[in-house]
Amino acid sequence: MSSEMLPAFIETSNVDKKQGINEDQEESQKPRLGEGCEPISKRQMKKLIKQKQWEEQRELRKQKRKEKRKRKKLERQCQMEPNSDGHDRKRVRRDVVHSTLRLIIDCSFDHLMVLKDIKKLHKQIQRCYAENRRALHPVQFYLTSHGGQLKKNMDENDKGWVNWKDIHIKPEHYSELIKKEDLIYLTSDSPNILKELDESKAYVIGGLVDHNHHKGLTYKQASDYGINHAQLPLGNFVKMNSRKVLAVNHVFEIILEYLETRDWQEAFFTILPQRKGAVPTDKACESASHDNQSVRMEEGGSDSDSSEEEYSRNELDSPHEEKQDKENHTESTVNSLPH
């Protein structure tokens, strides 16, 4: 090997050695199985893959939302017609007639609920607001005793509530805003059955998600304040598998539906969720009569079976008694809100 080639050979060898050292350092820096890093399970790997796909499709989802907004805008424009002057174009709307009936959600039970239930109440209020905005006969909507956890949750998760229209959101108690003689508290514990709605009155719905921890509380409050109270005529038209306590938004929507149809049974069956197992009272009576006949036919057995037959009849009379005491009357379903 000549003396001229020797420096080049030495320089090349040094470069190779440096590259080898760097590769060794990189390998040593990688986490090894069993050395401070646990192996990734298949489930974790799937989650990571899904997360990566979600991030990669972010722009695609954004584009789809943009296209959806454009499509809805075009649909709205197609529903427009020129006015008598021929200048502006107005949306073709149904004939909306505002009701004079005042419907109040009483939020004075804030201190009795945990945060999870506060969030459920917030969603139910959102649903009430959305349904009232699209109703044919919207009511005069009031939210009273607004504050505490509920207001904080709305401030954090739904800042747009300050721009809601056609709603009176007040920190005061409803008794400070409306005359006592105009108030009717809607509570399932009241012995009074509501036959029809008086649109000159103000009906109060208890804003309480209690999971049956505070039975009779709204009825007690109405009695303590000395205001009228009543319950919806649910038992006159509907037989349910569960207790007659309904979620705030269900009561609200039933009243909106009744104002449109003036038919309690239609209002109940339009609004009540299927999980309630609601059937018309006449069909429920026919079913009960058929069951009783079946029991009587079986009573022709020996006397030793009489105790079992009596137990069977008791079960038929109240098959859902335990379920009624345990069922939670709330529902978290939320629509996007118009502002």
Curated annotation (Swiss-Prot):
Task: Please give the PROSITE patterns that the UniProt record associates with this protein.
Answer: SAM_MT_TRM10
Keywords from UniProt, A to Z, are:
Coiled coil, Diabetes mellitus, Disease variant, Dwarfism, Intellectual disability, Methyltransferase, Nucleus, Phosphoprotein, S-adenosyl-L-methionine, Transferase
Which top-level group of life is the source organism from? Eukaryota
Q: Which GO terms describe its molecular function?
A: RNA binding; tRNA (guanosine(9)-N1)-methyltransferase activity; tRNA binding
* Gene3D superfamilies with a match to the protein in the record: 3.40.1280.30
Its EC number(s): 2.1.1.221
Q: Which reaction does it catalyse?
A: guanosine(9) in tRNA + S-adenosyl-L-methionine = N(1)-methylguanosine(9) in tRNA + S-adenosyl-L-homocysteine + H(+)
**InterPro entries with a match to the protein in the record:** MT_TRM10-typ, MT_TRM10-typ_sf, TRM10/TRM10A, tRNA_m1G_MeTrfase_euk, tRNA_MeTrfase_TRMD/TRM10
Q: From start to end residue, where is composition biased (Basic and acidic residues)? A: 14-35, 310-330
Cellular location(s): Nucleus; Nucleus, Nucleolus
Kindly list the positions at which Phosphoserine occurs in this protein: 336
Quaternary structure note: Interacts with tRNA.
Q: Which family does it belong to?
A: Belongs to the class IV-like SAM-binding methyltransferase superfamily. TRM10 family.
Q: What is the protein named?
A: tRNA methyltransferase 10 homolog A
* Record organism: Homo sapiens
User: Which lineage?
Assistant: Eukaryota, Metazoa, Chordata, Craniata, Vertebrata
